[in-house]
């Protein structure tokens, strides 16, 4: 059974009995971990929009804007995979100069995620951290994660409170919901920046 995270923002439409035992049971805008990106994009669109954002080029990404719920969704897949099987889904919502609303929405989403996968995961609560991409040390993120117990697949939810310097460069406070397969989590931890 697939669970539609795309409607997370309609929080009360979820029933408390819906459970997901595996990361591939979670779905965003019709796509789950293990699906082909060809389900929603043509191969030409994928190739035209494909980029490798990590030092290690093992995975490529595509940013998808034709979404009903989010401002953008980033999908990652093996660079040499012509089937474009999805290993990571990262959905983003913009909160212009409004970290308070972002954190409120994060809490709502985390509560729903906990109901869905809490019995099968270890929960790591919100912990304010410096945002490494801001050399001024004035931007912060508030991550929390649900890591599946049978592997390293996870759901991470976090808000970023960008500093005024970044906001003046047209960066905005944002909420991200990331769904990472075991392979992608291990890639980020051990290979992405080598």
What is each stretch, according to the model?
Residues 1, 10, 55, 64-65:
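Short intrinsically disordered, low-complexity segments
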Residues 3-17:
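Sec-dependent N-terminal signal peptides
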Residues 21-59, 90-194:
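Non-cytosolic coordination micro-motifs
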Residues 62-108:
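Mid-chain, structured segments of secreted extracytoplasmic proteins
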